[in-house]
Every structure is written in structure tokens, then in C-alpha cells.
């Protein structure tokens, strides 16, 4: 597996979901929207994902699985794929990071890193 990423960029936006959260029970729900941009000249396919989620107490959760939201999307050259998913942590602040395993048009697997992004309720300092 190649660890270099051929022109794949990921943009992430996270959002606190107040109506599904229960702070009194240490339940904080967050949605995240990820856009994967294929800036290369060839088609790629997202095969699997791996996430490390850490709350502000240092509790960690690793999530791995095939595809994203039940799909293994094919992303054409100069196109993008956006999806929304979510996670629950026990603190009002956390961080999430990970990577995707993708396959290029020649069937060669490579890793696309997703830089750490913050999960936080609005207007909180930590």
C-alpha cells in the first residue's frame, strides 16, 4: 500500500447537535460533514475508513469499517464526494482524526489522511 496521496483533499466541518445531546448524562452528539476532492486526473474509490476519536478526558475510541455511510464511492477526476455522519462523546470538547484507504484506477491502494478536527459545543474554551 502506498502512503502517498495523489491529489486527494479532505475538508471537514463539524457541528454540535444540541437536540440529540444530553449534557447531564455526559452525552454530546456531533455531526461532521466531509468533502473529499479528487484533484487528480484519474478516478479513485474510497474503500475503507479508520477514525480515532478522543474526548477531553483522554478517552479514545477507534472506528474502522468499509466505506462511509454504507457506500464505497467512486470519485471521478476533478470531482468531489460529500457525506455527513456523526459521533457521540462524553465531554463537550474532543478531537477526531483518521484516514481513508482508497484505490486508484490501476487498483493500487493508498492512504488519504484526514487532519485532526475539533468537536466542540459553541462558545466553549478548552
From Swiss-Prot:
| Lineage, highest ranks first | Bacteria, Pseudomonadati, Pseudomonadota, Gammaproteobacteria, Vibrionales
| Entry-linked InterPro entries | ApaG-like, ApaG_domain, ApaG_sf, Uncharacterised_ApaG
Q: What is this protein called?
A: Protein ApaG
> Residue limits of the ApaG domain?
2-126
* Gene name of this polypeptide: apaG
Source domain of life is: Bacteria
Amino acid at each position: 500500500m502506498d502512503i502517498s496521496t495523489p491529489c486527494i483533499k479532505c475538508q471537514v466541518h463539524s457541528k454540535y447537535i444540541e437536540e440529540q445531546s444530553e449534557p447531564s448524562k455526559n452525552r454530546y452528539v456531533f455531526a461532521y460533514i466531509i468533502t473529499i476532492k479528487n484533484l487528480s486526473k484519474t478516478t479513485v474509490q474510497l474503500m475503507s475508513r479508520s477514525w480515532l476519536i478522543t474526548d477531553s478526558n483522554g478517552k479514545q475510541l477507534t472506528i474502522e469499517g468499509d466505506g462511509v455511510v454504507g457506500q464505497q464511492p467512486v470519485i471521478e477526476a476533478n470531482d468531489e464526494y460529500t457525506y455527513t455522519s456523526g459521533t457521540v462523546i462524553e465531554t463537550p470538547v474532543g478531537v477526531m482524526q483518521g484516514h481513508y484507504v482508497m484505490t486508484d484506477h490501476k487498483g493500487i491502494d493508498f492512504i488519504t489522511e484526514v487532519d485532526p478536527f475539533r468537536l466542540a459545543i459553541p462558545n466553549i474554551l478548552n
